[in-house]
Amino acid sequence: MLSRSLNKVVTSIKSSSIIRMSSATAAATSAPTANAANALKASKAPKKGKLQVSLKTPKGTKDWADSDMVIREAIFSTLSGLFKKHGGVTIDTPVFELREILAGKYGEDSKLIYNLEDQGGELCSLRYDLTVPFARYVAMNNIQSIKRYHIAKVYRRDQPAMTKGRMREFYQCDFDVAGTFESMVPDSECLSILVEGLTSLGIKDFKIKLNHRKILDGIFQIAGVKDEDVRKISSAVDKLDKSPWEAVKKEMTEEKGQSEETADKIGEYVKLNGSLKEIHAVLSADANITSNEKAKQGLDDIATLMKYTEAFDIDSFISFDLSLARGLDYYTGLIYEVVTSASAPPENASELKKKAKSAEDASEFVGVGSIAAGGRYDNLVNMFSEASGKKSTQIPCVGISFGVERIFSLIKQRINSSTTIKPTATQVFVMAFGGGKDWTGYLPERMKVTKQLWDAGIEAEYVYKAKANPRKQFDAAEKAGCHIAVILGKEEYLEGKLRVKRLGQEFADDDGELVSAADIVPIVQEKLSQIHEDGLNEVTRLIKGL
């Protein structure tokens, strides 16, 4: 039986420097009462030259570590693998852009852009999304056709709700297709990627809310909205996922200057939602829609799209929702957002917000919001080309964006009660057991065996100590979440033998199997293949909900 005795080691850590707060002097304490306040201030003030910092991250940001990073890396790996499968190539753009590049692209959300101080004569801002920088890149390099994916951080001065994945610094995972192709073909593939991506991450209870910018603009024309008012009315409609129609109508009439008749006409349409076939049939039977040029173009696109979504077998995930407006100014065709049951705020959200002790507390009573979104933007590249004095070039684009923080929050909620996530990718721990005055601990020998495993692509570790006791080695293996131990016994190793043992409570009484040291790599590979015959690691299994 292998030794399992526990040896406790207490390590004392001495600080190399001590920060002392200045105290009030005896003179100050004996001063008149009138000077007490000044003395108190002086006692709290840092000494000149002393650095004082707040050890915290800025509001709306956080450090990521341990099991959270394991989950996030699995999300990135899953999505990047999916993008590559669809022919995507990756690019990287600066985290900040010239302010003029971002200006006028985000409608009312432009106020959320982080502006930087003057940088040597250039006014810059942190990127708000990955779409506008991509369009700038396409225009700047005269690219005619590209499938690109980009996984990177973006920044917004939003009211954060950290536990819901609403942050000021967050990752987006984007896939975009630029170029002229058959109508609705790239659009339908982007929708298919949305479904593939979310289901591969174990998110199955979701709907893709879909609308068409031209249909929405046609509805506004039918209702009598002036062209110059379209965007602000669109931003009001976009609030229907968070506010009731009565509140949106009030905004239209009292704040946006629309008549009751116009608002009611808009309301007749934006309350419609259902399957693609259902809503397409309703709109096709509406003479006002079919006689409006813009709306008719959008309706024709939907008819084409339905053939392709059926081919990709994704119809059941899509809801044709005329209330979806998306506030960003650059969309020209299909628009879509992915929502789940967690997207909406709780029913008593407004009451909970009132009871909250602070704005930060109140922000927790919101929904996760959309977890992915996208749409077609055919004019953005040309807008940059013309503005820079280049030849006008119409490069149609369509794309999708996965919100990593919001997806992460959903996955974290789902697996919190599941098996503990392995903090590392380590599969095998190499140990050595022995004793006596001549016992060296076999540190170089452990390193040699570990190197053999590394060379075979097997994740392995060992304790960085010459004579580590058995308990400490088992503890290290348990902390790393290892499945297998390769043990160098003092006498067995001299005979060219190694012991391979499964780890875990159910194998506590199992001494393992003695094998030839020359065969250690294939034997370990065989043992690992038996642990998960489907080839999936624990994190992937948890994310997929298996």
Swiss-Prot record:
Summary of the knockout phenotype: Lethal.
GO MF assignments: aminoacyl-tRNA ligase activity; ATP binding; histidine-tRNA ligase activity; mRNA binding; RNA binding; sequence-specific mRNA binding
Keyword Protein biosynthesis attributed: yes
A GO biological-process term: histidyl-tRNA aminoacylation
Reaction equations catalysed: tRNA(His) + L-histidine + ATP = L-histidyl-tRNA(His) + AMP + diphosphate + H(+)
EC number: 6.1.1.21
Lineage top rank: taxon: Eukaryota
Transit peptide start-stop: 1-20
Described purpose of this protein according to its UniProt entry: Catalyzes the aminoacylation of histidyl-tRNA in both the cytoplasm and the mitochondrion.
NCBIfam families: hisS
Miscellaneous field: Present with 26800 molecules/cell in log phase SD medium.
Name of this protein: Histidine--tRNA ligase, mitochondrial
